[in-house]
């Protein structure tokens, strides 16, 4: 069950490969994610010392959060993957043109997981072509239904 999707990632990048990673979260963050108070649109993944981190993911704390903690809504969160997967990703990202982007957050067996994608950036003309293709699909659907004046 997907909590939040990063639609901008699919518009800006060609997704070559997908990986599911665990997240190191605090208790208030899990509660806020369950309530749907999370945004991954501006988030990205970096590699530091053979570890992956999610940066820029905004989790808005609940109003009922504890008073003895100070919630940091945009803190850096560690991603958990197998060592083999991390080495594979490091090798791919070191190639020119590849990056890691978060695609969505979802629950797997009660745990919050982040699906990250090995991505290659789209050029402006690729984005335009994708938009034209989407518009043509909508137009074909209208023609098939007989709704020509829309």
Swiss-Prot record:
Keywords: Cytoplasm, RNA-binding. One of its GO terms (biological process) is trans-translation. It holds the Pfam family SmpB. One of its GO terms (molecular function) is RNA binding. Required for rescue of stalled ribosomes mediated by trans-translation. Binds to transfer-messenger RNA (tmRNA), required for stable association of tmRNA with ribosomes. tmRNA and SmpB together mimic tRNA shape, replacing the anticodon stem-loop with SmpB. tmRNA is encoded by the ssrA gene; the 2 termini fold to resemble tRNA(Ala) and it encodes a 'tag peptide', a short internal open reading frame. During trans-translation Ala-aminoacylated tmRNA acts like a tRNA, entering the A-site of stalled ribosomes, displacing the stalled mRNA. HAMAP family: SmpB. Belongs to the SmpB family. This is SsrA-binding protein. It comes from Polynucleobacter asymbioticus (strain DSM 18221 / CIP 109841 / QLW-P1DMWA-1). The gene is smpB.
